[in-house]
Amino acid sequence: MTKIKICGITRESETEMLNRMQVDYAGFVFFEKSKRNVSIEQAKEIKKHLKPSIKTVAVTVNPALDLIDEIIEAGFDILQIHKMQEFHENLKIPVWVAYQVRNREEAEEINVPDGISGILLDAPEYGSGKTFSWQDFPMKKRREWQERRIPFILAGGLSSENVEEGIRLFEPDVVDVSSSVEGEHGKDYKKVEAFVRKVREHE
């Protein structure tokens, strides 16, 4: 069964819909240039209201070790790293490494380090609402990760309109959505509900 991650949680009120819909992961962004950026303290307060069954993901961009230590101390379940410069082994937290897919050539050069807990594929531009070119992606890479039993997270431009196609093509372990389920004031209940329904209808 494909699991669901709702990313970019910024308000306590959003936890109610995640709890009600029994999603699997809630993502909190720790990157100042993002409009969804929150502080560690804000995230700690918000995540108190999530059901224990919902795992929390700390989303970062090439984080300093000090930030990683804060994330671990705050009790997050998973560390997600974009633009990783160096993979630090022996971190006391599972790590998802995110790669932006710009073209087929770059995708073919993705080398996933040993010891990570998941690989996430994202669009060339964060939060653009656009997918990377699914049809151009070298599926031999996907099969390689399956053989290595590395959990795979599909992100970047997913919506209730295209998530079924993404699941059919990639057979991801997790689908990750953010911008397409937002309204004027954060996450929109009906949009989140529509996305969750499409994922579960596909099973």
In which residue ranges do the predicted regions lie?
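Conserved N-terminal beta1-alpha1 strand-loop-helix module at the mouth
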Residues: 1-203
